[in-house]
């Protein structure tokens, strides 16, 4: 480490250390700087170094170290107050508050010492002339901590009644504490109202809204405001994650995961902060953390995952059950130390209540990448005795009811019958039905069982159902690819059932069953036709004839029989498929809709899902977006609880994309969130889930929800790949993420993402995206203070814009480089370089105008030229410091006025469409005239602006602003003239 040689160097070093991440490394550096300060033999240097050390300790996991530097500072103040400057006097009194709250968090410090310190703080604040607001706030903290609610209420009232002065906590911190008290008293809604200004960004500080976002999570869940809770978690955790000192807020996020069915994410959070299990510098936050660890581990154990490996204290592996026991013991031991010190049970009672909470939401989807909810293995608990099983006759009756009405769980009901019937002598019909449904459950392996079912049906005296069972076996054979064999196999059942039906020896249901199986076999032939998109006409005709035969048979019978109604609906869907194969998409849409309506009308909406989904795809192809949206919504509604996770994810994702395309980003985000959740549930998180998160991030970004979008997009990136999702999706995700990070002020990270995206786009045939990303990366690099890298990126972007013939992009890159050269004072550019770059930008505009005939293009180029002159003028005006010689200032302002006047002339040529840009330039020129001591010319420009807005709508904000500025300039110039 280079030694500190003077006070200024010490101050620079402390400022640099303040920007480092919280933690032991920053604390160690502060200790080194104090040692260096003591070598300077300057009392104020030591005072400032002690203050710096105290601050970094306070904002770290080593809060217990801050009492020593404060005691030394206080002794120095008492002995030689003249060594303190005004700022350090203020700082000394400010950190009295840190001491009182810090003492509360250390159970080894006696309560009497804390009360004595509180009295000392009140005395010193009174001597210094400060309000009692901070003192009453500190008293409230002590009273509420020990559980003296009456005193806490009195102190709370006095705190709010006292005047705010320079010693009061910032608005954000005060509101957090006040809201936390409302939560403590069971008033969640009132707390959230108090926190509103912090959550909305009206009041902020170094640790707010971080803590308010964390504290709001459980209240929001309790109030049923789950969407807000999700948003606060995503936004807040991003703020808390890099702040080592915020273990308490971090614990709130772990608690949220345990209470909202996000146990897997809770484990991920624990894994990120292993030191939080053992950091001992702040016992109070340690208790909070261990309490929620217990809550989470108990929840996992309750879910049957007690033996699952989990993150825990270093040095040994942990299971959820082991960590639950360990964390509970440690937490209660800490709580006992606090209660012993306080003489109450307050801390222990609160810790137990927190550990024993029940989940508030079964499962709240977050949208971020997740391993999925851990697979549960329910804990076996002793029961009073075996539950009485239904008798076989009841099981048979239930299975027949379900299958007769085509309910979703009919096959499972028949399997239950089969298990119960083992070793029981049954009638042939019962055995036939059992075999029939077992065959349905087994797929290709059940073909032989269909034959056995047919034999049993025949034995039971139902030849029609026997033919139907054989027909079902033939269809299953077709599903295996043996279409010709299936057609041959179904010929005999077809002829046989029709003969029986003609004789009145079987019913329409059995006949329809055989005819539908035959139609299904022929439809398999259509699907497997090697001619593909141009299917053989005979194949189509045969299938259509078979379908129409089914429809003719069931016509007139569907009202009384759900099964026959289903045959008719399926027949309409088959005709839709055939129409589509024949190239008639409009007819297919109509027939799919007819099929869906028929299924819903028959009380079988779950069968309509497939056809609404098909209809949605066709409607989208035909450009009917409204019908696409309707069909997707209908599919989700009709599927209800019977939709499997993969299908549900697909439908939500498709609907999200449709809604996003219609500009409804908020609703689109809701469906993309559901798509991400169900993709994870289906085990498709890395594929479909990544795409859903990509879309969700984009929709959140559109709403300006930058932090949430950034969390989601960052979580999507590890799974997105060019091979699976396309490199366009990877680039777009990085692009969006860069935009979010830029809005959040994380400019270095934004530049990194934009450069990564640009590197991929560099290999694309079309280079517009590459140029745009290079330009955006340059902006981020500039904001991050990486000026040389920013200039290089702007140069790269400019070359790309030139190669694309995009004059606007080229000109903007040149202007950006000019500003960068001036502001950053780049060694190889400086003011002369900035002038050259602005001049080059003007030349590019003028050259493009010479070769452009298209009027719209000329208008845009002329506007770009005007903006370039305007910026050139502004750059020149800012190029001289206030302390420069008068001649230098005069020369710079004259040059600036020349460029600004050019801008006015260029904008004037564009007519009324550019009136606002022209008047802005006119006023800028007027102020330059004023600075050059030309009041008459400045006044003339002001009058010109007022004239331009004669009769203009005063409701227009720009009009009002221009008039106000022009009147201000005119008044000042007239006053100067009068003098």
Protein language model regions, located:
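Residue signature of alpha-solenoid helical repeat architecture, marking inter-repeat boundaries
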Residues: 4, 44, 130, 169, ...
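Single-residue signature of alpha-solenoid repeat helices
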Residues: 26, 66, 152, 191, ...
